[in-house]
């Protein structure tokens, strides 16, 4: 009797962890996306006004689109995880989708981080000056967005490892 209950509790506990992690991932990705989309600042340098917006940077646009994809894929796999409890053959496909989502998240974070680094510190060899001295709020919000993006990546990475472990047992 005890063995039957123990065998049933493990998949339900696994499902609870899967659902919780996926909800946290969606929240972090949406927060990152929202902060980046609403980020805008106008500054004046030597009497010339310029605007800093996420849409002016291809790396920041990629981050936003990738976060949309992460949210959509994680929402899809949230439903998939619930189905995988009943049909164990779906667990490997779940792992595969989690892996692709994780790779998308880290590639977008890396591209946006590189752009943010150049914006903050410049690149003397290329002649690019840092802009964060002029648009403090914009750079601070980019940092917050990148932190949330990295959090979603870390959660996705942990989830992918957990899903791989679950797939091994089936």
From Swiss-Prot:
- Which stretches face the Extracellular side? 38-62, 110-141
Q: List the ranges whose topology is Cytoplasmic.
A: 1-16, 84-88, 163-170
Which Pfam family is an annotated match for this chain, by its short name? CASP_dom
Where, subcellularly, is it found? Cell membrane
Q: Which UniProt keywords apply?
A: Cell membrane, Membrane, Transmembrane, Transmembrane helix
Q: Does the keyword Hydrolase apply?
A: no
Q: Where are the transmembrane segments?
A: 17-37, 63-83, 89-109, 142-162
Name of protein: CASP-like protein 1F1
| Taxonomic placement | Eukaryota, Viridiplantae, Streptophyta, Embryophyta, Tracheophyta
